[in-house]
Amino acid sequence: MQTVFVQVKCKLGQVYNVAEEAIETVEKISEIYSTSGQYDLLIKCYLNDGEDIGHFINDKIQTLSGVKDTYTLITFKAFS
């Protein structure tokens, strides 16, 4: 399992709509946080090993209504 974080910039006034649509329609999303700064949302996803991250982001995240831009962070190791 691979953990991927996606920062999402939304069109004005669309943050809550994007978050609600994403959590309801994209099954690989674990959590969504609203954030301050350049991006409006931080989405935590768990993808299967070997799954094409680019296709996932392109097909599932960037196509959500109200998404303006994304920035993807690929993780290596979780420390606890």
Across the structure, where does each feature detected by a protein language model lie?
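A compositional/biophysical signature of low hydrophobicity enriched in polar/charged and small residues
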Residues: 1-80
